Amino acid sequence: MHTGLEISIPHNLQMSKLLDTINSPSDLKKLTLDELRELAVQIREELVNRVTLNGGHLASSLGVVELTIALHRVFESPKDKIIWDVGHQSYAHKLLTGRREQFATLRQHGGLSGFTCRDESPHDPFGAGHASTSISAGLGMAVARDLAKEDYSVISVIGDGAISGGMSFEAINNAGHLHTKFIVILNDNGMAISPSTGALSKFLNNVRFDPRFEFAKRGAKQTITNMPFGKSVWAFTKSIKRKFEKSMLPGSLWEELGFIYLGPVDGHNIRELEAALKCAKDFESQPVLIHMITKKGKGYDDAEADAVKYHGIAPKSGGLKSGHGLSYSQVFGQTLHKIMSDNPKVVAITAAMTDGCGLSEVAADFPDRVFDVGICEQHAVTFAAGMATQGYIPVVVIYSTFLQRSFDQIIHDVCLQKLPVVFAIDRGGIVGDDGKTHQGIFDLSFMSLIPDMIVTAPSDENDLQHLLYTAVNSGKPFALRYPRGFGEGVETEGTLRNIPIGENEVLASGSEIAIFATGKSVAFAKEAMEILAESGIKPTLVNNRYISPLDTELILKIAGNHKYLITVEENVLSGGLGSRINTILAEAGLVNAVKIANIAVPDKFVEHGNQSLLRAKYGLDGKGIAQKVLSLMANTGEAKHQQILCP
């Protein structure tokens, strides 16, 4: 496969000598410009090699190699604070800040995180994983610095996608008001913003980056304002300058917001980047925005040609994740397509996740009814609420981890008004290698506690399609939570049907022990039943597809004729399925009549690691569930209520 790298990728995956000599950012200051360019090539080689093996975010990291080098030459990390928005483009930063020898462990269990992490290195002053946080965090650090009368620089690096988030503009507005010394680097990779990059802009940037220009400007202001009528002359001159810039230059918006604007800068030209950074560093009483133009996937032909595809790749593959059958996201997309074909009132809304959420074909066929609002989850929910008031049925499609950002809007703008908004919660449960910031382990809890919200988790592809159909027809706020990865391989029924709200399903009838599992955990409970059958144990298995409202009648009936009751979920224990069933049993006075165990994710932030490894570690796979069942049945001398969280 042709990569477009200037140096061929070594098959033995050993980094060549120059990169191997970089143990800290200070080592970069010894290199010549030619050596820095060579280093950039070697960094890209290592990124392609490692991410191809381990998986991760490739295109974004390839696009900021020169910026990373320039930042660490101009500034003194960790004294100076470099904050990477989202953090998925920080791989080169990790290589240059003392983590080169650990880089082989990237996104591996117990290894380096795929994002910035405060626990990992002092060079990561702020952890990330979600977008649009860097400017707020950086401004907070800069203000804290000034209050403490300390002296260091704070630099926030944010992409043109993340800057579309409302939180970014809140921070920009605040920063301009405070007039704090602070640098924001806008990494514009051409996927959202199209600024002027012509000869005039380049000429003016060459002037702006020259410290002599700033000195001359200040001197001219002092000279003119000291003359008779000088202040009026200076004001007139500035007004002419502003009018010219507004008509010709892309930075006028930022200057109106209180920032000094520098750019556009060639983000792959180390010399030009260093000049811009040094210039920005010298401004004392105003925030500076450096507008940098980069190529996402730079240096790797496949990634440059399809930056969306190579935004994130699977382990041991240079392309998209592979597997058998359809993923839950694909089944969702196909079902929604069918529903939208039949019902013109159904619309889809997503927050910069059209491809990841399986909406590409839907968007292609219904371009007027699919809305990608950018990285704006709060807006997405209230936008949906507004459409719902006018008779439309919005389906909001968001990853579980990002839905957390719109919690107030779900309560205030949807549920309080009982609006029929459907929440399609993708990547629910254990997500895997992206780690703590991306695990979808809180959604069952925070969605179930909201009054009037229906919360469901399908056990397979059939459940998913029927529950989506039910959600669209319910006329109520409705949450549909499904996992990352491929389905169970079941054959889907051709006709969609409503599943009565609150009605759960007995999949297998047994004796003594009952397992209430929800979502993906149903498949693992089935595996556990096969293991238990070898010991002559035949449990009752319930597909607990409705978490709110619960099927109280079924729970009480089964609790009344079984000795043991197990709940299984890929969600934290607090507020999840097990917690809610415990409450029902307590209110019915059955806590002492049946022995209970809740198998769930611990109430903690779950580390990165592949899904199978993490499920095994926390006892959520078939083997783990079977072991807990056997342990519960054997442990008759213990308290009747056990919360089983891990092996």
UniProtKB/Swiss-Prot annotation:
It is an enzyme of class 2 (transferase). GO terms for molecular function: 1-deoxy-D-xylulose-5-phosphate synthase activity; magnesium ion binding; thiamine pyrophosphate binding. InterPro entries: Dxylulose-5-P_synthase (IPR005477), THDP-binding (IPR029061), Transketo_C/PFOR_II (IPR009014), Transketolase-like_Pyr-bd (IPR005475), Transketolase_C (IPR033248), Transketolase_CS (IPR049557). Pathway: Metabolic intermediate biosynthesis; 1-deoxy-D-xylulose 5-phosphate biosynthesis; 1-deoxy-D-xylulose 5-phosphate from D-glyceraldehyde 3-phosphate and pyruvate: step 1/1. Binds 1 Mg(2+) ion per subunit. It holds the Pfam family Transket_pyr. Its cofactor is Mg(2+); thiamine diphosphate. Mg(2+) binds at residues 160, 189. The keyword Transferase applies. Keywords: Isoprene biosynthesis, Magnesium, Metal-binding, Thiamine biosynthesis, Thiamine pyrophosphate, Transferase. It catalyses: D-glyceraldehyde 3-phosphate + pyruvate + H(+) = 1-deoxy-D-xylulose 5-phosphate + CO2. Thiamine diphosphate binds at residues 88, 129-131, 161-162, 189, 300, 377. Its EC number is 2.2.1.7. SMART domains: Transket_pyr. GO terms for cellular component: cytosol. GO terms for biological process: 1-deoxy-D-xylulose 5-phosphate biosynthetic process; isopentenyl diphosphate biosynthetic process, methylerythritol 4-phosphate pathway; terpenoid biosynthetic process; thiamine biosynthetic process. The keyword Manganese does not apply. PROSITE patterns: TRANSKETOLASE_1 (PS00801). Catalyzes the acyloin condensation reaction between C atoms 2 and 3 of pyruvate and glyceraldehyde 3-phosphate to yield 1-deoxy-D-xylulose-5-phosphate (DXP). Homodimer. Belongs to the transketolase family. DXPS subfamily. This is 1-deoxy-D-xylulose-5-phosphate synthase. It comes from Dehalococcoides mccartyi (strain ATCC BAA-2266 / KCTC 15142 / 195) (Dehalococcoides ethenogenes (strain 195)). The gene is dxs.
